[in-house]
C-alpha cells in the first residue's frame, strides 16, 4: 500500500485550504500531512483513524487540536481524495 498517491482536493477542501493559508503553523502542518499520505499512506505516527457511520470510507489525521484532515483512499487508482481540512468533521 505504499508508493506515490495522487491527491485530489474537493471544492470544499479547497475553500478550507484558503482559510488555512492565514495560519502559517496550520499551513505547514497540512503540507506535511499531504506529503506524508501521498508518499506513505498508512505511516504511523502521526496516528490516523478510520471513521465510522456515514464517513466509514474516510480516514482522519489531526492537523492540530481543533482541525482534522479527512480523506478517502481509492487504492486501485492510487488516488487520495481530500474531503476536509478545517474543523472537526463539520461537512
Language-model features: where?
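Acidic, metal-coordinating catalytic cores used for nucleic-acid/nucleotide bond scission
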Residues: 55
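Blade/loop signatures of beta-propeller domains
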Residues: 39-41
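Enriched for short, Lys/Arg-rich terminal
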Residues: 1-6, 12-20, 24-31, 45, ...
